[in-house]
């Protein structure tokens, strides 16, 4: 077999599809391997200088770090940039071939491999975001339920927190004993979510104090621990961008263009 020049890998939960080409762009290697075997088979097959491409999906940054530690160049591609290179029906084999093709394009944009520290910070933010959604849902559930008993719940979360204890203590507001117990349980749930969010806010503040890049970002007007640490997790090394607009586009801060005709 000729020497592999590029290998595209379609990642999945349990089965990974690999597609390799040589320097003349001829397909010379296709393998479908389980999660426990694919890395060993790949490392036994490829030689130094072979480039490896993957979609920037779940698990991609972990495997990219593993391969980089072995001295290989890994290129992560956003899924929307791989899709145009799928030649026929979507399946694992065609996806791996499309990844292998996309990574060879001279103007392709790649995703920087995140460090473990970046992913730790990202995990904190995602968990916090999920808890905020849960808290909003819990507050809305309380508002909807008490409305059935003739109570008007305030829209502000702080006002709702103040109203719930007064509802529980007011014996003349028409709430049944069973619903008072249920409302008390919901109140406990809401307080627990508040505690979790507060703990994560404190952790984010600590991370922002410890990270030198986050410290520099906080010197900008309007940038606090939340934004600073979120940028560190999302961007990492800003030198990958040639200008600020490129970084803004990668974060989704620039408007998408849907016009035609160069207008």
Each model region followed by its residue ranges:
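Phosphate-backbone recognition surface of nucleic-acid-processing proteins
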Residues: 85, 216-263
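Glycine-rich, often acidic, oxyanion-interacting loops/wings at catalytic, nucleic-acid
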Residues: 126-216
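Short, basic/hydrophobic alpha-helical segments
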Residues: 34-51
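Gly/Thr-rich phosphate-binding beta-strand-loop-beta motif of the actin/hexokinase/Hsp70
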Residues: 2-21, 99
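Extended, structured, electrostatic nucleic-acid-contact surfaces
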Residues: 1-4, 198-223, 231-237
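Acidic beta-strand-to-loop metal/phosphate-binding motif
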Residues: 49-57, 99
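Short glycine-rich, Thr/Ser-proximal phosphate-binding strand/loop in the N-terminal lobe
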Residues: 12-37
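Short alpha-helix plus adjacent loop in nuclease-associated cores
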Residues: 75-123, 164-166, 261-263
């Amino acid at each position: 077999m000729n020497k592999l020049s590029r290998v595209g890998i379609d990642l999945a939960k349990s089965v990974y599809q690999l597609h390799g080409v040589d320097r003349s762009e001829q397909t010379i290697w296709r393998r479908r391997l389980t999660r426990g075997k694919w890395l060993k088979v790949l490392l036994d097959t490829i030689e130094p200088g072979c480039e490896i491409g993957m979609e920037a999906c779940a698990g991609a940054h972990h495997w990219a770090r593993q391969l980089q530690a072995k001295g290989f160049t890994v290129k992560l591609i956003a899924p929307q940039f791989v899709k145009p290179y799928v030649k026929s029906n979507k399946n694992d084999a065609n996806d791996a071939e499309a990844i292998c093709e996309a990574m060879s394009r001279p103007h392709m944009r790649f995703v920087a491999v995140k460090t473990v520290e970046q992913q730790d910070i990202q995990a904190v933010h995602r968990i916090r975001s999920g808890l905020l959604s849960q808290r909003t849902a819990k507050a809305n559930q309380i508002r909807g339920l008490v409305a059935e008993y003739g109570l008007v719940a305030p829209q502000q979360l702080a006002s709702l927190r103040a109203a719930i204890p007064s509802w529980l203590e007011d014996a003349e507001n028409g709430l049944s004993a069973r619903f008072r117990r249920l409302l008390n349980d919901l109140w406990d749930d809401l307080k627990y979510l508040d505690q979790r969010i507060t703990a994560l806010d404190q952790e984010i503040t600590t991370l922002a104090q410890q990270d030198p890049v986050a410290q520099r970002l906080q010197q900008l007007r309007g940038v606090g621990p939340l934004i600073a640490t979120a940028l560190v997790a999302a961007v990492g090394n800003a030198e990958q961008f040639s200008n600020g607009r490129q970084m803004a586009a990668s974060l989704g801060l620039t408007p998408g263009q849907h016009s035609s005709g160069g207008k």
